[in-house]
Amino acid sequence: DAKQFDAHTVLGSILLGHKPTEVHSTMVAHLTKALIGRLIDTDPAAVVGLKGCKNVAEVAARKAELLDTAYECGLYHDVGKSAVILNIDNNGRRLIDEEFQGIQTHPAIGCGLLQEAGCGKYMAPAALYHHRFYNGQGGYPKDVPPCPPEVKVIVDALSVADSLDAATDNIGRCYQMAKPFRTLVGELKAQCGTRYAPKVVALFDDKDFCAELA
């Protein structure tokens, strides 16, 4: 509808204000969609609950809709960086503590922007929780309630997708060096069950799927 179009136009304009964030967000959107699509194809029971899907048959029937939502959640997950990034990561050096604390505000800022844009049901919580650990025991922001179950699997996929692209990307990032894909997969597996969702990490056991992503 017109309201949704206007919201997406505004949000897209925000991303365009910082090209590295736009590129990263687009890549994360594609990766999140790919991960959710793979889960639907190989383990649809893991996706039950997403957007209220009650069983695997409903997951299969609504696959296109679920993939669209996964893509949008990935595309706008970092929209909150618009408030902090221009003053931080163009300096060609590692972040100082105060700057990293500023970066840590972007999930809550993004959640607020998405709620104001009328995208509060799925995209806003995806933005808020994408740096929280799968087990709820780490990450940021702190002191937030558990992630809503109707979007949790997208957040689980988004968290992996965000780490995957961020850690393999040299563009516009002064606070860490890019890593080889295999190295990152090893790190995902090392933090499986704590930071990352086991069912999402298990997708990387498929060499053909890894080849598609790498």
Where does each model-flagged region fall?
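Short amphipathic alpha-helical interaction patches enriched in hydrophobic/aromatic residues
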Residues: 11-18, 114, 168-172
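Conserved beta-strand-loop-short alpha-helix elements that form
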Residues: 155-169
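Histidine/acidic-rich helix-loop-helix segments that form or flank divalent-metal centers
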Residues: 51-74, 114-159, 174-176, 188-214
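Residue-level signal for cytosolic alpha-helical hairpin/rod architecture
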Residues: 8, 67, 107-108, 161-164, ...
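Short, charged, surface-exposed loops that flank catalytic or proteolytic processing sites
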Residues: 93-95, 172-181
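An active-site-proximal "capping" alpha-helix that borders the catalytic cofactor pocket
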Residues: 27-36, 102-115, 180-196
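Acidic, Mg2+-coordinating active-site segments of isoprenoid diphosphate-utilizing enzymes
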Residues: 78-92, 131-140, 165, 170
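Acidic/His-rich, divalent-metal-binding segments that scaffold phosphate/diphosphate chemistry
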Residues: 1-104, 121
